[in-house]
Amino acid sequence: MGNTLGLAPMGTLPRRSPRREEPLPNPGSFDELHRLCKDVFPAQMEGVKLVVNKVLSSHFQVAHTIHMSALGLPGYHLHAAYAGDWQLSPTEVFPTVVGDMDSSGSLNAQVLLLLAERLRAKAVFQTQQAKFLTWQFDGEYRGDDYTATLTLGNPDLIGESVIMVAHFLQSLTHRLVLGGELVYHRRPGEEGAILTLAGKYSAVHWVATLNVGSGGAHASYYHRANEQVQVGVEFEANTRLQDTTFSFGYHLTLPQANMVFRGLVDSNWCVGAVLEKKMPPLPVTLALGAFLNHWRNRFHCGFSITVG
């Protein structure tokens, strides 16, 4: 008897399982579209500042700040923060209560709450001594691939005035995010609305963002050259003020020296830089900054010490 070979019919060949596509990510908040680029630029410093941070527990910490400047009177700020037990990410903890009060009694306070798994709420209050300046309420819903936000600013039912801001962001692909912003304001004898469209494209080493509306345009480009060098380019145009600004920022990290350098140059002939130096094993950070505006012939320099 000869050997019998069984051949499977062509139609019964094993099929490959269909490739499952990864779900689109959440685009984040509208206010964070330009954050990567803005973090490259240095914060302006002037005068001498001493900051002492103290962690009282795993949930509560305080900070004392003393600022002396040639442009104004010396000031003192007390900063307190409370963080709850619900941590969604390394930078998001709920509930969170943050407050800052200066020596004149003015208060800035912010409360963050997680009402549901996808629903967040925020309340912001600002006072000047005994007078309320700002009260703002935000509601944000984060879906699988979109974010919707509604903000009410200074609502006054008696005076019939309010500022409403609506944001929406949608992830179209893993790299492309599109959305918009609608700002509506109303007060006696006046009301209006401004629509702004936004887009963000994220590559492996760079991010480009653009906001365009009737009020102007805001474009930014962030590029991470390597683990130490980051650059940012920002363009802002305001149609109401008829003003246009172009800025270039530079961020350099030197881990072996425990130093961080930030610099900027803009189209208003302003040049500035801030150098931060950590002093291990002491919990001390030194910062030295200088800013020169050639057009207005103004020079500002500052020095700060942060403990804790």
UniProtKB/Swiss-Prot annotation:
Region (Disordered): 1-29
Spans annotated as Required for mitochondrial targeting: 281-308
Keyword Acetylation carried by entry: no
Keywords from the named record: Ion transport, Membrane, Mitochondrion, Mitochondrion outer membrane, Porin, Protein transport, Transmembrane, Transmembrane beta strand, Transport
Entry's Gene Ontology cellular component terms: mitochondrial outer membrane translocase complex; mitochondrion; pore complex; protein-containing complex
Primary location: mitochondrion
Cell compartment(s), UniProt: Mitochondrion outer membrane
InterPro entries, per the entry: Porin_dom_sf, Porin_Euk/Tom40, Tom40
GO BP, one annotated term: protein import into mitochondrial matrix
Subunit and partners: Forms part of the preprotein translocase of the outer mitochondrial membrane (TOM complex) containing TOMM22, TOMM40, TOMM40L and TOMM70. Interacts with mitochondrial targeting sequences.
Protein family according to the UniProt entry: Belongs to the Tom40 family.
Identification of the protein by name: Mitochondrial import receptor subunit TOM40B
Species of origin: Homo sapiens (Human)
